[in-house]
A protein has these predicted regions:
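Short, low-complexity patches enriched in S/T/P/G
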Residues: 1-8
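Hydrophobic single-pass membrane-insertion segments
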Residues: 22-34
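Hydrophobic membrane-insertion alpha-helices, especially the h-region
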Residues: 8-24
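Juxtamembrane loop-transmembrane helix junctions in multi-pass integral membrane proteins
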Residues: 3, 36, 98-101
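Short, solvent-exposed, charged loop/turn and helix-capping segments
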Residues: 85-111, 162-165
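C-terminal amphipathic alpha-helix
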Residues: 33-80, 112-165
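Alpha-helical interaction segments
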Residues: 14-15, 92, 106, 145-146
Length: 165
């Protein structure tokens, strides 16, 4: 005959196994985050504001590097963080599933962010050239490309604003 203590321990073990299997069964298998946008105007305005903060900080750091106030290595660290933040915004725009009336504005904003990210990559190349004591011709070619990419980003940003419903 079974003792009370043995029956209680058996019941506790069965409850623990049942609870653990239930918890495991309830755990989500798809851990990807998705962006659900209900107000596309506020969403794109938020993206624009974050972009302005990131670009202002990065541009300021770039000027400080050019002026010799910070080292190229310090700038590269800052630029890589800025690039990562811009990439996050690009992903956010892509995953937002903009409606037909907002798609043009979102696509132009996306191109603006991509151009700015290319701009950041070119500034990193310039920082590496400064570290390596490259020739003036190489640096001036990169500076021209940097300005073109920055201007392209601004133009796409204006197109994004003008194409909003």
């Amino acid at each position: 005959m079974a003792s009370k203590k043995g029956i209680i321990i058996t019941i506790i073990i069965l409850v623990a196994i049942t609870a653990a299997s239930f918890v495991i069964w309830q755990m989500p298998t798809n851990l990807q985050m998705s962006v659900v946008v209900s107000d596309f105007n506020l969403h794109i305005i938020g993206i624009d504001e974050r972009y302005k903060m990131i670009s202002n900080a990065n541009d300021e750091s770039f000027e400080e590097m050019i002026d010799g106030k910070i080292s190229p290595d310090e700038y590269i660290s800052i630029a890589e963080i800025s690039s990562s933040q811009i990439n996050s915004q690009i992903i956010e725009l892509v995953e937002s599933n903009a409606t037909d009336e907002w798609i043009d504005s979102y696509l132009n904003n996306l191109e603006s962010l991509r151009s700015y990210n290319s701009y950041i990559r070119e500034t990193i190349i310039l920082a590496n050239l400064i570290n390596g004591n490259a020739g003036i011709d190489e640096k001036s070619d990169i500076l021209i490309k940097i300005e073109q990419l920055k201007q392209e980003s601004k133009e796409y940003s204006k197109l994004s604003i003008s194409s909003r419903p």
